[in-house]
């Protein structure tokens, strides 16, 4: 099966995601590195699925251990720098300003963001089309604002 067919059957259908668009490569394959279009609500469903360790409505959708493996940093993109962003399986791993909490995020072109903060049970989605933003700061700015809003 092609990736888009597999995702539609095994991931999107169980989550009730029906309105998707996946860009394709010149050979007709799904552009799986970043060509998926979802509504904000459906993107939040993916975040919630990760927040709940791959279980949706009592049913395991993702293999046991997949969430932990996919959000474990494999690459440090800015070694030795404060708040260095690390990368797992298509997830950016972001330490908070105080280093006490870690979030992970799917960051899309133009400001599309899915941020999950497991320790605080937060799933946040941002959509937009600011293709001129400075990519180094936006994920942290969003995370800092989320945490400030829920801090006592």
Outline where the language-model segments fall:
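Active-site rim elements
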Residues: 30-34, 103, 132
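A beta-strand-loop signature enriched in Asp, Gly, Thr, and Trp
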Residues: 22-33, 53-82
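Active-site Gly/Thr loop motif
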Residues: 17-20, 68-123
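Structural helix-adjacent loops and short alpha-helical linkers that scaffold large soluble proteins
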Residues: 1-8, 54-62, 135-136
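Active-site-proximal alpha-helical segments within enzyme catalytic domains
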Residues: 34-55, 112-129
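Active-site helix/loop module of the DD-peptidase/beta-lactamase fold
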Residues: 1-34, 38
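Structured C-terminal helix/loop/strand segments within mature extracytoplasmic catalytic/sensor domains
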Residues: 106-152
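Non-transmembrane alpha-helical segments in soluble domains
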Residues: 4-8, 12, 44-51, 67, ...
């Amino acid at each position: 099966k092609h990736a888009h067919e597999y995702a539609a059957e095994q991931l999107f259908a169980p989550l009730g995601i029906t309105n998707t668009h996946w860009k394709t490569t010149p050979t007709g394959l799904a552009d799986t590195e970043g060509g998926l279009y979802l509504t904000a609500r459906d993107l939040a469903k993916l975040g919630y699925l990760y927040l709940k360790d791959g279980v949706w409505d009592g049913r395991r959708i993702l293999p046991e251990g997949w969430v932990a493996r996919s959000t474990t940093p494999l690459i440090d993109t800015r070694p030795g720098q404060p708040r260095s962003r690390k990368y797992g399986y298509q997830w950016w791993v972001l330490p908070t300003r105080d280093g006490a909490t870690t979030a992970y995020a799917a960051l899309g072109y133009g400001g599309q963001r899915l941020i999950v903060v497991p320790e605080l049970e937060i799933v946040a989605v941002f959509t937009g089309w600011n293709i001129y933003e400075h990519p180094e700061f936006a994920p942290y700015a969003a995370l800092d604002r989320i945490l400030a809003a829920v801090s006592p």
